[in-house]
Amino acid sequence: MLIVADENIPLLDAFFQGFGEIRRYPGRSLDAASVKDADILLVRSVTKVDRQLLEGSRVRFVGTCTIGTDHLDLDYFAEAGIRWSSAPGCNARGVVDYVLGSLLTLAELDGVALPERVYGVVGAGEVGGRLVRVLHGLGWKVLVCDPLRQAAEGGDYVSLETILQQCDVISLHTPLQRGGQHPTWHLLGQAQLAQLRPGAWLVNASRGPVVDNVALRELLLDREDVHAVLDVWEGEPQVDLTLADLCTLATPHIAGYSLDGRQRGTAQIYQALCRFLGVNEQVRLAELLPKPPLAQIELDASTDLSWALATLCRAVYDPRRDDADFRRSLSDDPQQQRAAFDQLRKQYPQRREIEGLAVRLHGEAPQLAQLVSALGGVLV
């Protein structure tokens, strides 16, 4: 059996060497010739998998180590009888950590208290839903917009207009849909961006085209009160250099790039391939993940809640480092800039997640205990 895989998928040998030969390629350069003889194709979001890539090949199974599937032509898969799997929720916790770290940075810049802001989450799937649960656990006010879930479940969902008009912070976590009843391509265009409240913060860690980047650039040129945090970009790996300069935080599509999340994605498509082939799983992710470098954090019962929040989050991840690395990589040479974008992702340092972080409290501190629990930490 021949497996063709994106070279940046972690733990390829550990999970897949027992199935046959593995050939690795840069994800953006995968073409029909590369996959012609493959039985299994393993990709990330940078590879468009469609009729043009697969027609005439032997591919029977496609696995993507990502939550999103907008790079997969699922209609063609159905037509051609190709089975597929994504990795839902694999990097959700990493994205939540990214959002929390970004909020801490913005709060320090603006001198505001995070519990006093109103949060709007657009898209309540694996990532957005996890973020909503964390924010609710912290006791913060959260409004949620998700028309698909609202139609299926009812509940306390609000419109996008309500989010724009009432929320100080808007975090986007939608898939990219260009058609259908609820398209998300340019979900925030010029008209929507104009409705942002004074001093609003906008975070996009979903897909670049969910926000009209040209309209956002023009807004930021006109409104210094608005902060934008972008991890995803229209046309990436090419980036609008002016827009990047105007963003308070700018990063190269790494919000979900925790070590745990990336390896979890590989494990999930391994499990799906085992089901497809009808074989038992022989490899367990828990046996492959290294121990976290930070064994435990200790807090005194008198610790200020805001200080504890910042300490716990930044002990695991601080997006300011990624922002600085990204800005240093930006170049007026388009080819050099695209290469640097991909290189930052390829050589991304190991980063763990807050979830599971061991925390010891000295003394009775119910509010601190609640904060630790909301973040996903474990009291020891």
Swiss-Prot record:
Main subcellular location of this protein, as a coarse class: cytoplasm
Pathway membership: Cofactor biosynthesis; pyridoxine 5'-phosphate biosynthesis; pyridoxine 5'-phosphate from D-erythrose 4-phosphate: step 2/5
EC number: 1.1.1.290
Pfam families: 2-Hacid_dh (PF00389), 2-Hacid_dh_C (PF02826), DUF3410 (PF11890)
Keyword list, A-Z: Cytoplasm, NAD, Oxidoreductase, Pyridoxine biosynthesis
Catalytic residues (UniProt): R207, E236, H253 (proton donor)
Enzymatic class: oxidoreductase
One cellular component term from this protein's GO annotations in UniProt: cytoplasm
Binding residues for substrate: S45, T66, Y257
UniProt: NAD(+) binding residues: D146, T174, A205, S206, R207, D231, G256
Homology family: Belongs to the D-isomer specific 2-hydroxyacid dehydrogenase family. PdxB subfamily.
UniProt subunit comment: Homodimer.
NCBIfam families (alphabetical): PRK00257.1
Protein's UniProt name: Erythronate-4-phosphate dehydrogenase
Organism, scientific name: Pseudomonas putida (strain ATCC 700007 / DSM 6899 / JCM 31910 / BCRC 17059 / LMG 24140 / F1)
